[in-house]
Amino acid sequence: MTEQTTEITAYERSVALVKAELTQYKPKQIDTVLGLLQDGNTVPFIARYRKDQTGSLDEVQIREIEERQRYLENFEKRKEEISRLIDEQGKLTPEITAALSKATTLTALEDIYRPYKQKRRTKATIAKEAGLEPFALWLLMTTKDSVEEKAATFINEEKAILTVEDAINGAVEIIAEWISDEAKYRKQLRQFTQKNGVVKSVVKKEELDEKKVYEMYYDYEEPVKSIVPHRVLALNRAEKEDVVRVTIEVDVTNPLTKIKEEKIKNPSSPSAAIVEGAIKESYKRFIGPAIEREIRNELSEKAQTQAIAIFGENLKNLLLQAPMKGQVILGLDPAYRTGCKLAVIDETGKVLGKSVIYPHVGASEAKRAQAGGQFRRIVEQYGVTLVAIGNGTASRESEQFVAEQLRQIPRKVVYTIVSEAGASVYSASDIARQEFPDYQVEERSAVSIARRLQDPLAELVKIDPKAVGVGQYQHDVPEKQLDEQLDFVVETAVNKVGVNVNTASAALLEHIAGLTKTTAANVVTFRDENGKFTNRTQLKKVPRLGPKAYEQAVGFLRIIDGTNPFDGTDIHPESYDVAIAILKKANAEKLALGSPELEEALKGLNTKELKEEFGIGQETLELVMDGLLKPGRDPREEVAGPILRSDVLKMEALQVGMELEGTVRNVVDFGAFVDIGVKQDGLVHISKLKKGFVKHPSDVVAVGDIVTVWVTELDLKKGRVDLSMIGPENKNS
């Protein structure tokens, strides 16, 4: 019973702390969000269908409240645990209780607990067992008496204290540990190091860095307070690979002098020098290394959090790229000797045909001669309108080949380069084997390349998000944290768009709010066994899809051309009565959803009356109206599509000052990589993204953006292109 009370108290205190911390939200919003989450509602459901209650908070804001509450509840529980552990030792005082109450970080809590923690056997504990604690206390009194004479009284052969020196050394160990355990000294020295410390790196084994990736860190330093996150991760990686040694250096003369002044009451005492030595020893062996570890951990955690956030933002923009609807697409997985694999998909993603051609060096002359004709025949046979070329090995040679062939086709067929990051991971996965059991791995890749252009979201959810190529130092961040963030991003993106329940794969459905891997598979099995769903109510018959899961999921599951037109919208069934009443009031029951006539009919409605009649807020009313007026809405259609090309651009043709259009492929701390149609993506450094100060590249560009760039530097030998998004006319203005 006691445990339950404690848990409730910790939860309640954590809620109060969230309100005090996250002042950008009203207390009522925080209570509402946490209440809805406790009732088993999902983040996407709350964000879309409970806007009236939350004040239109989005998924990111809801998750921020959820995560902060969870962290603070664990923090409060740790506080209670420390209080209990100290109390069990009979050492809990009002001062300690007050200090615990004031603590706002885990570091502060652990500093308070440190003196009471069960220690492993140290030199200080051995010295205490040898009876030297009274001697240590005497030394701290800094009397005028002789240290040697006092030390002699503690010689004890049985306890291995054989000399005066042994006694003094033992007492120094005890004093050093006491000082190390003082929370206030650790706090002072930690803050001093954070403010004045310098992160330094020196080369350790240069031969391990063959490509000179870490050359700038061979002799490098940067203040702790201003070091940027991506350099922290680069240093960590260089250190992990044994290329450099990293330390934090700081001159602690001033703070140690203050400790000395506080501890040494009588500087002329014979014991003063010994106490001073103990203070230095305490810092050198205990406090200093611990603070260095803590600060490096803090810097790493901060850098990892940012790297995860950037990865999440890049992934979101990648998933929400515009789909290429209504196109017959030929996917081409490039290769030299083994041939380019081709796969054609129709407007729905169904595979129409596949083939292999050998247009490149490595294949026989005869095969190369046949490749062009084979390619053109396939394009004509299936009515291909768009070619998707993977950006891997032989990509640019394949682009040249495709451009040459398309010039010989009388009608307009265009191509684009598609990132094939993760295509090989997908091709060898269980999902791919289930979809295409009789295909070779490379043939599956060609299908994936075509489909990820046609519907990026539906295809990319089949791949581990870590494999899609938009991360930064993703192997240097905690996997659990990264997975949680990426799962959240995928879930948010899928629910933002919604899915057609009659065509969606289980891999896509499992990200719908309220569904799991099992229930998603059950939806597909039910569909296969019983035919297409004709209304949303049928979803209730799916095994293991209970009332709560149905409530959470149904609004995100669309049934196109079903028996109820509302089922093709994102209006939730709980609001169908509102939708029917709106149409009745406007005498528009027979008008098609999304039609100009319906839009006209709804213009004159008194929305205030509707809200009062149904007891709903403005947000729910707007959601219903949007569903009636834009039934097939897809937020991705507002995003610019990929750059479609009909001719190739060679690296050699680039010139400094040349203006180009490109696609942002990756955003990192120091800039953005842009595909301009040559072999290597060009880098737009953060300083070249726009005029003026840029806090982070993601404030200016996002993955998938189409941008205008100018070539600022070329290195054909290294295949490097530097770009700028600041036009020549704005350079000096």
Predicted regions and their residues:
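Generic start-of-chain signal for non-secretory N-termini
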Residues: M1-D31, Q38
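Duplex nucleic acid-engaging cores and interfaces of nucleic-acid transaction enzymes
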Residues: T2, D58-E64, Y71-G331, A335-Y439, ...
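Accessory alpha-helical DNA-binding modules that contact the DNA backbone or grooves
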Residues: T42, T54, D58-E158, K496-E638, ...
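A glycine-rich phosphate-binding loop feature that marks nucleotide/adenosyl-phosphate handling sites
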Residues: Q191-V198, L332-Y336, T393-E397, V418-V425, ...
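Long, charged amphipathic helices and adjacent flexible linkers at domain junctions
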Residues: E294-G312, A467-G498, K611-V656
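Long, charge-rich intrinsically disordered scaffolds of nucleic-acid metabolism proteins
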Residues: A108, T416, G422, S427-V497, ...
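Low-complexity, acidic/Ser/Thr- and charged residue-rich accessory regions of DNA metabolism proteins
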Residues: T153-V164, Y220-E221, L256-I264, S269, ...
